[in-house]
Amino acid sequence: MADRKTALVISAHAADFVWRCGGAIALHQELNYEVTVACLSFGEKGESAKLWKQDGMSLTKVKEARKDEAQAAANALGVNDIRFLDLGDYPLRLDQVAQEKMVDII
């Protein structure tokens, strides 16, 4: 496994990696890279307007839906390693604990 090339995608919101670099991810998967996607936030506030319009929606349900969407997209792209840091949304702050989580991923 040590000889396998790796790629790291850092995505501010759970779905950003798909439309910002889905093609690059697919290409790297095809080239046998081990791709890791790190989602800093679920985008539960600024990226989830349609979900919030549904009856009975809660913050927990929005996050679960966004996680499921991102996981499905990662699966479609062949990504086996997707990490969700759940750092919040609007504001998204990278405090010391969050920085340490990123260092662990890198």
Model-predicted segments: where are they?
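Active-site rim/loop-helix segments in enzyme catalytic domains that contact anionic ligands
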Residues: 1-106
